[in-house]
Amino acid sequence: MLLAHAYPDANRVVTGILELTLNAIEHGNLNIGYKEKSRLIEEERLDNEIERRLSDPLYSSREATAQFVRRPDRLSLHITDQCKGFEWRKYLNFDPERAFDTHGRGIAMANKVSFDRIEYRGNGNQVITALQLGTVAPALVA
């Protein structure tokens, strides 16, 4: 992902950028909920459903935007989608209840590994990431 190369450590942020962008598209603009995504993955139909919705006039005109800002002390990324929002707080941290689900850890990965901070605004359809310049990636637990 090209945008990751704007950061001092592209490997640190690439997963977070990808996960938050995919969330804006899949869960936001295409309105695929958590349980529905679980079912579609189980039935091996997620890709087909995404393609179907991308062709559906109800969803096809929706846009997700990403704005990258470089400041002297930090880098930030603001991603906005056109969804009705969601309850994002329960996804900020890793949850043992979802540990073995086929998805559902992207926001926590972005929050705990990729960026120093993420913040949701509005109804949950806007996320802002921050990475302080000069910080070191958190150590991963073995």
Placement of each model-derived feature along the sequence:
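Alpha-helical phosphate/pyrophosphate-handling elements in metalloenzyme active cores
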Residues: 1-9
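General structural signal for secondary-structure boundaries
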Residues: 6, 31-33, 69, 76, ...
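Conserved ATP-binding N-box helix of the HATPase_c
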Residues: 8-60, 111-112
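Glycine-rich/acidic phosphate-handling loop/turn and adjacent ATP-lid/helix
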Residues: 35-104
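Flexible, glycine-/charge-rich segments associated with ATP-binding catalytic modules
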Residues: 74-78, 82-87, 91, 96-100, ...
